[in-house]
Amino acid sequence: MKISTTGIKSVLLVVAVLLLLPTPSRGIPAFARKYGVRCYTCHTVPPALNKNGYMFKRLGYRMPPDEMDGSKPAPRITELDQKIKWDLINSFAILLQASVSGDKNIAETGATPPSTETSSSSFNLDEAALFVAGPVPETGFSYFGHYELYQDGSNFLEQGFGVWTGGRANSNYFAKGGEMHLQEGEGTRAAMFYNLFPDPSYTLTNVDPNGVTLDQHPVGVDGGYTWASNYFKKIFALSFKVTNGLAADGSEILNSSTKNSKDIWVDGDYWFGPDGGVTAMYYHGSKDQVQNAGTDSQFTYTPSFYRVGGFGNYLFFDKLDILGGYVYSHDDWAWDQTSPLSKYTANRYRGEVDYYIKPGFALMARLDRGAAQIAPNPTVHDRAWGAGMEYSMTKLGNIIVRGTYNQEHDADPVAVLGSTDKLFKVDFRFMW
């Protein structure tokens, strides 16, 4: 594997700076260092969020208060964390992930031979990322930045935004602007991209023939409202985003563009019980699409699309987490410039079972299935399943080893062909 010199230098520079800064003896990710807690305060196993971690995020990266019993008014947002001293080192965190993997791919050809097979094995530097986040003391403002020092041979800004949060801990509202994830980190646990596997659920991340996916980080604005009962036993939240959306090549529009229409995303969440929740999600937009690229029949049009999703999970006995979800996809589709528009439709389901043997030690299994069609082509079916184990090597939860096996069958509704990928992976994640 070829690793860019720039990426390695960036990683070494950040590590050196962080090591030279004065730190407490227990080096754990920034928020845990700041509050003197373990990673499990906000995570089941990092990066999967629990109810407390969800509320921490909704409060603008402020810790939910323990004393919210209803006997007196809940503290205002500006009153939270008043006893926590701001420290530069507690605003920064670094993540490093490396792995060893074996991969086998079988692709249908529609010809002779009917399929081709390739295999590979490698040691990998999966990711090196730098985070900066936290509230501005004595104000309602907070900030978040996520820079990929190295990922897939390049470095780039993944997220960067500012937030203003007002109200009280039990009834608050926020406004956010900048480059942010569309779906990742949003919703209750079954809807979040954050999970125990190396990659999010296929139901959430699949890319349709128009290049549309929920796995994007566009520039836009975000607003929302959150209500919580005493001790945060129940949480109700609404969020609304307006973003630039996607360019013709499927990349995020980060600056000026001739695409003047905006995409909208709406999410409603309800948390209940020890750590259960349900989420309803709607995403609507449009994008420029280059059809039949590189041929004499190439043309450009602007299809509209929408996604509707429902998700839920419940944690039994603080041990067994059962998750499920459904996403319906609907896109315009043009075979040529003269025929009436056709439609791309897809129905996908996901199910997952996570069993926590003890804090930081979990077994997991999941299944995704779906069907998609572009008339008049026949319906094609895709599926993905995986199983694995995740174990924290420290009591603090910041060094994790994980082993997983995933098998995924992708079906192309345009070519009516598919491919199957089988991946075994052991990865090591260090968070500081």
Give the residues covered by each predicted segment:
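Detector for outer-membrane/organellar transmembrane beta-barrel domains
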Residues: 233-235, 259-374
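Outer membrane beta-barrel transmembrane domains
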Residues: 348-408
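Outer-membrane beta-barrel architecture
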Residues: 129-131, 161-163, 222-224, 267-269, ...
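The canonical Cys-X-X-Cys-His
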Residues: 36-47
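Residues that define the transmembrane beta-barrel architecture of outer-membrane proteins
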Residues: 119-128, 154-158, 215-219, 260-264, ...
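Outer membrane beta-barrel
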Residues: 50-51, 87-245, 260-262, 268-280, ...
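Outer-membrane beta-barrel "beta-signal"
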Residues: 38, 389-393, 398, 419-432
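Gram-negative outer-membrane beta-barrel proteins
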Residues: 100-110, 151-155, 183-187, 229-231, ...
